[in-house]
From Swiss-Prot:
Family annotation (Gene3D superfamilies): P-loop containing nucleotide triphosphate hydrolases
Name of the coding gene: cmk
One annotated GO molecular function: CMP kinase activity
GO biological process: pyrimidine nucleotide metabolic process
HAMAP family: Cytidyl_kinase_type1
Binding residues annotated for ATP, in chain numbering: 12-20
Assigned keywords, A-Z: ATP-binding, Cytoplasm, Kinase, Nucleotide-binding, Transferase
Any one GO CC term of the record: cytoplasm
Protein name (Swiss-Prot/TrEMBL): Cytidylate kinase
InterPro entries found in the cross-reference section: Cytidylate_kin, Cytidylate_kinase_dom, P-loop_NTPase
E.C. code: 2.7.4.25
Superkingdom of origin organism: Bacteria
Enzyme class: transferase
Keyword Cytoplasm in annotation: yes
Length: 223
């Protein structure tokens, strides 16, 4: 039964390293990996492609229900995301997509539509799920829960370096402002607000290297 499959949830705000840590931990454990944020971004992309008005809840819910999302791992280990059979990986990573996804994620009907789809990722031998409400809403019965945090300034700096490395010109101040705004939206929304589960291990990654965070998370599961 799916309920017997172990789940490790890793929640936290944007830019704390959830995705990087989750992928490494999943690979080390040999478990499946769920990037819940990619699902919301995929719906955001599909809605944008279909010119859906973000104020039209009915249309957005239909879009969330109809959008086909597939994850394909390349030979180099990179995960590509296909939205309605089109590789949308690069579009999903754009800042504008993240902003739209955050707006869409605040709609309760959309979250309800995607909830069951996320829960279907729970398969043997185990699942590492990263997002914002994995441990509080999607998998409240998860055996292992982690909540990652980091100061907004540090998260903005990490994102700034990522974008500069890709040749994308961006203002640090604008990035910091957007991260703070997204934090506020995620924490204050009426449905599934961003917060740690009562039984989650809290890890502040502000001054930590990725391998240090990975070690703490793995210790939670293996010790």
């Amino acid at each position: 039964m799916a309920d017997l499959v172990p789940v490790l949830t890793i929640d936290g705000p944007s830019g704390v390293g959830k995705g990087t840590v989750s992928k490494i931990v999943a690979a080390r454990l040999g478990w499946h990996y769920l990037d819940s944020g990619a699902l919301y971004r995929a719906v955001a992309v599909a809605a944008d492609w279909a010119a859906v008005d973000v104020s039209d809840t009915t249309a957005l819910v239909k879009c969330a229900f109809d959008t086909c999302v597939n994850f394909a791992e390349c030979a180099d280990g990179e995960m590509r995301v296909l939205v309605n059979s089109i590789d949308a990986t690069d579009v999903l990573r754009m800042e504008t997509t993240g902003v739209l996804a955050s707006t869409i994620a605040s709609i309760s009907e959309v979250r309800a539509t995607l909830k069951k789809r996320q829960q279907m990722f729970r398969r043997t031998p185990g699942l590492v799920a990263d997002g914002r409400d994995m441990g509080t809403v999607i998998f409240p019965d998860a055996k292992y829960k982690v909540f990652l945090t980091a100061k907004a300034e540090e998260r903005a700096q990490r994102r700034y370096k990522q974008l500069m490395k890709k040749g994308v010109s961006v203002m640090f101040g604008a990035l910091l402002e957007e991260i703070r705004a997204r934090d506020a939206r995620d924490a204050c929304r009426s449905v599934a607000p961003l917060k740690p589960a009562d039984d989650a291990l809290l890890i502040d990654s502000t001054c930590m290297e990725v391998d240090e965070v990975v070690a703490q998370v793995l210790a939670l599961v293996t010790d």
